[in-house]
UniProtKB/Swiss-Prot annotation:
Lineage, top ranks: Bacteria, Pseudomonadati, Pseudomonadota, Alphaproteobacteria, Hyphomicrobiales
Origin: domain of life: Bacteria
Recorded GO MF terms: ATP binding; glucose-1-phosphate adenylyltransferase activity
GO BP term (any one): glycogen biosynthetic process
Alphabetical UniProt keywords: ATP-binding, Carbohydrate metabolism, Glycogen biosynthesis, Glycogen metabolism, Nucleotide-binding, Nucleotidyltransferase, Transferase
Binding sites annotated in the UniProt record for alpha-D-glucose 1-phosphate: Y107, G172, E187, K188, S205
Subunit structure: Homotetramer.
Protein name: Glucose-1-phosphate adenylyltransferase
PANTHER family referenced in this protein's UniProt entry, alphabetically: GLUCOSE-1-PHOSPHATE ADENYLYLTRANSFERASE, GLUCOSE-1-PHOSPHATE ADENYLYLTRANSFERASE-RELATED
Organism: Rhodopseudomonas palustris (strain BisB5)
């Protein structure tokens, strides 16, 4: 380190990732897994983005709190995030809800998911806690947020971004002054307030918070003792600090990581089937808004050992081909054609099948002579020969989960019911 250059604050921080939510708006896609464990981008899980941001920012102490159907998530974390070494002052802890405070008490809210593990946090003695939601897709340098937190002497610093006012009721909405001190904070209001001078925009919380550890622990004890609290950061902790302390907003534009191919700040909630489908399909664009090829800010994940993707057959109507598509390792495209499609590991697509605008999760098998358009196919689903989806909205809605925008979610139980 050169003389006069301060050491990164991330060295003294611990990232605490909240990854216990179901994500019920993803419908059957989260029947078997928590939302942070949902697949994204061909190889990754959604949680890999928050974890990779922490790692790339220089944070070497990470904890992940899990609750809802956590097996898939825990297995992924054990396989893909097992490279932290205590001898280098690194740690990676998985913290399932385990009735640590009371025999009849699981995590009661996001704040309680931290409160029940205060002893683990204290054992590492970090100076700062970077509290993260494990279910968003974005690239962000948390070091810059830590710097603002210290420079402004905040009790809490809240990551924020502008969204359309029509969408803001799904988030915590804030109002800030000229120095970005938060003057009001409303969690998921029915009528979100607009930003000054921007009647169609609202400033919303990203679910990312920076605290001094000592202050956070004091607030968690205070909140835990309040019988009227729902023990949630957005509903209880943050509004209290806004009224009684100093809460500062950190604008995502200041710390968003962009490669040379990215010209906008990319952040997605992917909380609905339509949003999930669109965010994955966007990656098939010639220049996608999210650059997964950025070697300076890699998205770390578990890399399953697979052979290369394989394309076979070269006859008219039976040509193994893919255009504007992402095809992961272990896939075999046997006489099928793909357009604007994303295949995860180990997918097989058989002869005379045409697939367009599809997100197909690992080890699904697509039969012969199928036509699939605008679909999400869950992992390990077996699509029977000749199935047509995406051409008859009424029939699709009877057989599968069809979204408002016409995306069809296909799971194995839905396929099994076709024969009954």
């Amino acid at each position: 380190m050169s003389q006069g250059v301060p050491a990164p604050l991330a060295r003294h921080a611990m990232a605490y990732v909240l990854a216990g939510g179901r994500g019920s708006r993803l419908m059957e896609l989260t029947d078997r897994r928590a939302k942070p464990a949902v697949y994204f981008g061909g190889k990754s899980r959604i949680i890999d983005f928050a974890l990779s941001n922490a790692l790339n920012s220089g944070i070497r102490r990470i904890a992940v709190a899990t609750q809802y159907k956590a097996h898939s998530l825990i297995r992924h974390l054990q396989r893909g995030w097992n490279f932290f070494r205590p001898e280098r002052n690194e740690s990676f802890d998985i913290l399932p809800a385990s009735q640590r405070v009371s025999d009849d008490m699981w995590y009661r809210g996001t704040a309680d998911a931290v409160y029940q593990n205060i002893d683990i946090i204290e054992s590492y003695d970090p100076k700062f806690i970077v509290l993260l939601a494990g279910d968003h897709v974005y690239k962000m340098d948390y070091e810059k947020m830590l710097q603002q937190h210290v420079e402004q002497g905040a009790d809490v610093t809240v990551g924020c971004l502008e969204v359309a006012r029509s969408e803001a009721s799904a988030f915590g909405v804030m109002d800030v002054d000229a120095k970005d001190v938060i003057r009001s904070f409303l969690e998921k209001p029915a009528d979100p307030p607009a930003m000054p001078g921007k009647p169609d925009k609202s400033l919303v919380s990203m679910g990312i918070y920076v605290f001094d550890t000592k202050f956070l622990i004091e607030e968690l004890h205070r909140d835990a003792a309040n019988p009227d609290s729902s023990h949630d950061f957005g509903k209880d902790i943050i509004p209290y600090i806004v009224k009684h302390g100093k809460a500062v907003a950190h604008h995502f534009d200041k710390s968003c990581r962009r490669s040379h191919a990215e010209d906008t700040s990319y952040w997605r909630d992917v909380g609905t089937v339509d949003a999930y489908w669109a965010a994955n399909i966007d990656l098939t664009d010639i220049v996608p808004q999210l650059d997964l090829y950025d070697r300076e800010w890699p998205i770390w994940t578990y890399g399953e050992i697979t052979p290369p993707a394989k394309f076979v057959h070269d006859k008219d109507g039976r040509r193994g081909e893919a255009v504007s598509s992402l095809v992961s390792g272990g896939c075999i495209i046997s006489g099928a054609s793909l357009r604007h499609t994303l295949l995860f590991t180990g997918v097989r697509a058989h002869s005379y099948t045409h697939i367009e605008g599809a997100v197909i999760l690992p080890y699904a098998d697509i039969g012969r002579s199928c036509r699939l358009t605008n679909v999400v196919v869950d992992a390990e689903v077996r699509i029977p020969d000749g199935l047509v989806v995406g051409e008859d909205p009424e029939l699709d809605a009877k057989r599968f989960r069809r979204s408002e925008n016409g995306t069809c979610l296909i799971t194995q139980p839905m396929i099994d019911r076709l024969g009954t």
